[in-house]
């Protein structure tokens, strides 16, 4: 069973009071001390004054009050030492300071510090007659003298004779707050993972240190995201900075219950130190507010009038004041807030911790609950409220109850959670509710422009309503897609079922397959039904009568689709109906019917309202025989309708923007398209009957034209001068149309695999907007036309598999970024005549596979932006030494360079080197790269099938890798990374049969199990080195495009708790480098070694639990395996041996690694690198984000934590 234990308290001690005040009553009780106590209490500080015990209470009770206080204020006055009671107090206070860090603030009221310290002046007499106090106990008297001296040396305050007492009290209060914060700060609860980072972000926006402005900050987010919690933490940590402060809770509820005038009176009462201000008599008390620096938090604000009534205008507040408005309505903040903090969801780790703390009282689940915990965390999607309520409901229940609860939640949302979330829905008006439910039930994740068009009506401007829903945190619009939280989605669908829940035909929105089958088979639908979305994967068959849609007269949305088969899935057998339906509702706006089983639409259907029509994979031959009113149509998709003959019925679709006819293999006429003057997108891919475009065919608005796969298309003419993307891939054209310069907006020209294409137009260079030119696979193309003028926009030029032997003059392609010239492996013809790339300073990716290159020019180093260089299958024997100056180079592909004998010093930022199959390679530079300590830069060196590398060379490679891992790990610790870093810092691979001897844990097979020594996870722990030997020789070879060597580690404690991680040791990805890649085949054993940084919450596990060492990991296991590109385990190769070492940071003076040879050259060069790096420009050493190649590298070296705990 799952049991909870108490989590850490939010306070550090069990103190009942903030401050104990020690004073001499006769001196100050009725003036200074009474003022001080009143002032402290007015600022919210809990004060104990020993005046309460003057009536004869025992001194032991007085000492108890000192012990129950966080700090003491000692008011030294003229007669203070004449009271043995006061002396006892100060002795006890100083004892507590020494033993328990009790805070002490001395105030010297009309007495000098030196008199207290040296017992002179008024403090002298009592110590001249020691028998009068403490019965002459000399030891006690000496202790009191030391206490007085120590107290007087503490920084405190001397009462100013000629200054204002209120100003003096202000200073005391400020210092008291500071000391209380230091002694017992508002400790952020450890049962709220993620709250610290969120509160700091809010504090940044509030800019507390700036007293020259009044600042209003909004805290925004959906219900249950933690807005109030974050603001409350910030409030409690900072309220002491202000003269007045108040946190008004739940204004929406309290304003309805008590009214805004009451809340405003309450606010003023707190801000003005309890003064009763009659708002009705005095109006708004601006003068009172201007005199104080205030901190106000308004929680759960839902209306503009609440802000106006409670806060008013900013100019009535004193500079330095701060106001926080907590709301789920962004619109309220647009004119009232200077900045807005949007509270994010919890990430996976934070969510798992919060859930486990609620249920188990620890940061991780017990072993039997791991998988179910992951499922519940996934269900909550980072919403703290959901995690707390779910955890509360699961507390003390066994695993069977958990399983049943999870199954129940898949169908029925949690009632308590839904009740909380519905408050947001109930605040909407009718139009907002309608649009919200349509999105939740039907259109979640669709494009926002599409949804607004579909939901638009005479009464509703859906675009405005969607913006309002976004402002209220009920939906988000990201990358033009409309999204909502999973739990809000579930809430919307639950609300959608509520009306007439027993009669499906009377509900407005239907998606349950049983309900839909019922109303279609029994014709029980009514005009109430607004939308029907049927997932055909959930039903076997439906008897569809011709009159099935007759009663659904108000139906607007109809969709029959298959979630299991996005492509053709033979869905026509589902509907058992021999004839076309008699009727479709004329109010249909949205009609999607995948695999529509009839050859036309109902003849009496008037599509005057139809905006979106999709009949992919249908049996339709034509839409209608007669012309229809289709002016509302904007999107039509008839893709893969193999029987479609023509487009009759669409000639009046003058507002159509997108027409998809992909795979309509019987279509050969496009006459109706001529009238589509608003058409932007036309897809005719794989229309194999299409031989040419109609003469005089012009569509001025067209921007994307796809003719790829039209195998019979031999001729192409320009049909729009507005085209931006032109796809002619795989067509039979022999030349591109002349006068192509008229395509002044053309960005992409795709001529891939046009095998009959022999010529490109001479005026190609006049395409001034062209960014990407794809010529790959144009095997008959032997040359490019001269580039007579600069093509400044061209960034991508792909010429793989062509017969081109001379590249164009690259000086006119000065902004070229990616150039690929890869020739097939079977092509033994002459390669490139020259390499004219020296002037391309922006070139970042260069692919030159199988180009018969035997030498790189020295000017190659001028390609200062180059990040990916592929030279595979060339005749190079060595690389120029100047290659070291390619400081941006991340990836170097040298696969199958069979003549390559040596490698010089390579660029310092290189992250991925693949020298597979370099059979002549004997020597590598020492070091291979200068190990710059760029933060979190990972490196992979692959030397598979490099059989001439001797053992010394391999050891040097490993030594360099280990040195670099130490430097990177030290940098990582220096930057104090938080979270989980399991990436391999360095990974190497080479032919071999043995685990290096310095690996302390070695086993045959693929599993290591070991007990952990005490204190193994000390402050110098930085990760692990891992090693495996993989055999390929008993197999025909590994043919996967990707191979990853992975390790699943499991750390377990005595009490059964555990945490599991997945490491990556390295491997390869054939898509890295050459675009003409092929799976590699290995025929021998290979060694894989990696050094993995491991900054994981292991310390937190042991330190933050109250079970002490029982929670500290005491055993560990490491299981190694191999996966392919689909993450499936590989069975075609075997792990023979494995090894593991923990890594610890070296002392600064340690110049050696344990058990491994490090050459002097490596040590010397690394030291030089550490010195040199300080003098380099930031652009040289910063970590660059490089798009595709960077993604490929990280994809190769990435690793993951399995859901926090093991999944």
From Swiss-Prot:
Record carries keyword GTP-binding: no
GO molecular function, one term: ATP binding
Listed SMART domains: TIR
EC number of this enzyme: 3.2.2.6
Statement: the UniProt record of this protein carries the keyword Nucleotide-binding: yes
Result for mutant: residue 955 to K: Enhanced susceptibility to Hyaloperonospora parasitica
Domain TIR: 15-180
Domain spans labelled NB-ARC: 201-445
UniProt repeat feature LRR, residue ranges: 607-630, 653-676, 677-699, 720-743, 744-767, 769-791, 792-815, 840-862, 863-886
Effect listed in the UniProt record for changing residue 726 to F: Enhanced susceptibility to Hyaloperonospora parasitica
Keywords: ATP-binding, Hydrolase, Leucine-rich repeat, NAD, Nucleotide-binding, Plant defense, Repeat
Positions annotated as active site in the UniProt record: 89
Domain remark text: The TIR domain mediates NAD(+) hydrolase (NADase) activity. Self-association of TIR domains is required for NADase activity.
Record function comment: Disease resistance protein that cooperates with RPP2A to confer resistance to Hyaloperonospora parasitica isolate Cala2.
UniProt family annotation: Belongs to the disease resistance TIR-NB-LRR family.
Name used for this protein in its record: Disease resistance protein RPP2B
Gene name linked to the record: RPP2B
């Amino acid at each position: 069973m799952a049991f909870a234990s108490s989590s850490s308290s939010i306070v550090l001690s069990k103190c009942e009071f903030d401050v104990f005040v020690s004073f001499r009553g006769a001196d100050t009780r009725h003036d200074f001390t009474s003022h001080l106590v009143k002032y402290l209490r007015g600022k919210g500080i809990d004060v104990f004054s020993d005046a309460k015990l003057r009536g004869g209470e025992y001194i032991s009770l007085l000492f108890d009050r000192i012990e129950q206080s966080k700090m003491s204020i000692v008011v030294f006055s003229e007669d203070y030492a004449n009271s043995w009671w006061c002396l006892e107090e100060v002795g006890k206070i100083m004892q507590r300071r020494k033993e328990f860090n009790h805070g002490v603030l001395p105030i010297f009221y009309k007495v000098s510090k030196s008199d207290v310290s040296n017992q002179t002046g008024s403090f002298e007499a009592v110590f001249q007659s020691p028998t009068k106090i403490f019965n002459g106990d000399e030891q006690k008297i000496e202790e009191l003298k030391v206490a007085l001296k120590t107290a007087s040396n503490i920084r405190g305050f001397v009462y100013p004779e000629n200054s204002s007492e209120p100003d003096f009290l202000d200073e005391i209060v400020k210092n008291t707050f500071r000391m209380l914060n230091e002694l017992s700060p508002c400790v952020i609860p450890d049962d709220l993972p993620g709250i610290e980072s969120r509160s700091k972000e809010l504090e940044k926006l509030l800019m507390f240190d700036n007293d020259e402005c009044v600042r209003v900050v909004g805290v925004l987010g959906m219900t249950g995201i933690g807005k109030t919690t974050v603001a409350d933490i910030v409030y409690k940590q900072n309220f002491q900075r202000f003269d007045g402060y108040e946190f008004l809770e739940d204004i929406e509820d309290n304003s309805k219950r008590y009214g805004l005038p009451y809340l405003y009176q309450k606010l003023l009462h707190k801000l003005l130190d309890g003064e009763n201000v009659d708002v009705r008599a005095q109006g708004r008390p601006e003068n009172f507010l201007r005199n104080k620096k205030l901190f106000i938090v308004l929680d759960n604000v839902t209306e503009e009038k609440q802000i106006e009534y409670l806060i008013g205008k900013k100019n009535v507040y004193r500079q330095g004041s701060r106001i926080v408005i907590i709301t789920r309505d962004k619109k309220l903040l647009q004119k009232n807030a200077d900045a807005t903090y949007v509270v994010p969801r919890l990430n996976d780790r934070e969510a798992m911790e919060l859930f486990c703390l609620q249920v188990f009282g620890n940061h991780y689940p017990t072993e039997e609950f791991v998988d179910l915990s992951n499922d519940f965390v996934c269900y909550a999607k980072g919403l703290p409220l959901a995690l707390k309520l779910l955890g509360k409901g699961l507390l003390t229940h066994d695993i069977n109850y958990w399983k049943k609860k999870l199954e129940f939640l898949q169908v029925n949302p949690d009632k308590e959670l839904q009740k909380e979330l519905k408050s947001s829905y109930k605040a909407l008006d009718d139009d907002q509710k309608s649009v919200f439910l349509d999105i939740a039930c039907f259109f979640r994740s669709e494009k926002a422009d599409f949804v607004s068009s579909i939901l638009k009506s005479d009464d509703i401007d859906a675009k405005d309503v969607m913006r309002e829903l976004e402002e209220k945190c009920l939906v988000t619009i990201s990358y033009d897609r409309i999204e909502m939280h999973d739990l809000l989605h579930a809430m919307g669908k639950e609300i959608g079922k509520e009306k007439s829940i027993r009669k499906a035909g009377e509900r407005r929105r239907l998606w349950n397959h049983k309900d839909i089958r019922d109303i279609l088979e029994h014709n029980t639908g009514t005009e109430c039904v607004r939308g029907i979305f049927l997932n055909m994967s959930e039903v076997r068959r439906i008897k569809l009568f011709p009159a099935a849609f007759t009663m659904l007269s108000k139906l607007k949305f109809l969709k029959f689709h298959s979630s299991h088969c996005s492509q053709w899935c033979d869905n026509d057998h589902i509907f058992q109906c021999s004839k076309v339906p008699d009727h479709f509702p004329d109010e249909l706006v949205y009609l999607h019917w995948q695999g529509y089983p009839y050859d036309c639409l109902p003849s009496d259907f008037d599509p005057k309202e139809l905006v979106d029509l999709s009949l992919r994979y249908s049996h339709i031959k034509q839409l209608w025989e007669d012309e229809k009113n289709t002016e509302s149509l904007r999107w039509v998709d008839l893709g893969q309708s193999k029987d479609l003959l023509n487009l009759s019925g669409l000639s009046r679709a003058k507002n159509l923007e997108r027409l998809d006819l992909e795979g309509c293999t019987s279509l050969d006429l496009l006459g109706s398209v001529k009238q589509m003057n608003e058409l932007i997108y036309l897809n005719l891919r794989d229309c194999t009957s299409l031989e040419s475009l109609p003469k005089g065919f012009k569509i001025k608005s067209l921007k994307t034209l796809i003719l790829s796969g039209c195998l019979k298309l031999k001729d192409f003419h320009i049909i729009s001068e507005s085209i931006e993307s032109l796809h002619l891939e795989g067509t039979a054209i022999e030349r591109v149309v002349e006068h192509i310069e008229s395509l002044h907006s053309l960005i992409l020209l795709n001529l891939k695999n046009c095998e009959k294409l022999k010529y490109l137009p001479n005026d190609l260079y006049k395409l001034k907007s062209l960014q990407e030119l794809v010529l790959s696979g144009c095997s008959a193309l032997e040359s490019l036309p001269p580039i007579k003028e600069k093509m400044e926009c061209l960034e991508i030029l792909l010429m793989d598999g062509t017969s081109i032997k001379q590249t164009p003059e690259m000086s006119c392609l000065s902004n070229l970024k990616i150039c690929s010239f890869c020739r097939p492996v079977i092509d033994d013809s002459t390669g490139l005549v020259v390499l004219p790339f020296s002037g391309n300073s922006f070139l970042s990716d260069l692919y030159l596979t199988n180009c018969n290159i035997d030498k790189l020019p020295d000017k190659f180093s001028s390609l200062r932006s180059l990040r990916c260089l592929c030279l595979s299958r060339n005749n190079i024997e060595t690389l120029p030494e100047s290659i070291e100056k390619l400081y941006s180079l991340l990836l170097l592909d040298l696969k199958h360079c069979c003549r390559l004998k040596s490698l010089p010093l390579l660029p310092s930022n290189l992250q991925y080197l693949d020298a597979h199959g370099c059979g002549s390679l004997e020597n590598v530079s020492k070091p291979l790269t200068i190990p710059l300590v760029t933060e979190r830069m990972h490196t992979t060196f692959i030397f598979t099938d490099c059989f001439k590398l001797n053992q010394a060379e391999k050891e040097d490679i490993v030594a360099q890798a280990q040195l670099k891992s130490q430097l990177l790990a030290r940098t990582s610790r220096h930057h104090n990374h938080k979270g989980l870093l399991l990436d391999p810092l360095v990974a190497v691979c080479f032919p071999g049969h043995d685990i290096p001897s310095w690996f302390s844990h070695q086993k045959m097979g693929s599993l290591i199990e070991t007990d952990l020594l005490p204190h193994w996870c000390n402050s110098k722990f930085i990760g692990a080195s891992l090693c495996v030997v993989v055999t390929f020789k008993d197999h025909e070879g590994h043919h996967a495009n990707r191979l990853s060597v992975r390790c699943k580690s499991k750390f377990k404690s005595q009490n059964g708790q555990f945490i599991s991680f997945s490491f990556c040791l390295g491997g390869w990805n054939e898509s890295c480098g050459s675009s003409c890649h092929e799976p590699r085949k290995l025929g021998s054993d290979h060694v894989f070694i990696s050094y993995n940084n491991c900054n994981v919450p292991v310390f937190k596990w042991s330190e933050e639990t109250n079970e002490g060492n029982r929670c500290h990991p005491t055993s560990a296991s490491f299981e190694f395996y191999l996966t392919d590109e689909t993450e499936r385990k590989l069975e075609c190769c075997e792990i023979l041996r494995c090894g593991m070492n923990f890594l610890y940071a070296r002392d600064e003076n340690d110049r050696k690694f344990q058990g491994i040879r490090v050459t002097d050259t490596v040590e010397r060069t690394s030291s030089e690198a550490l010195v040199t790096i300080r003098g380099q420009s930031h652009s040289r050493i910063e970590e660059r984000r490089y798009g595709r190649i960077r993604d490929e590298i990280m994809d190769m070296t990435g690793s993951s934590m399995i859901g926090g705990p093991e999944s």
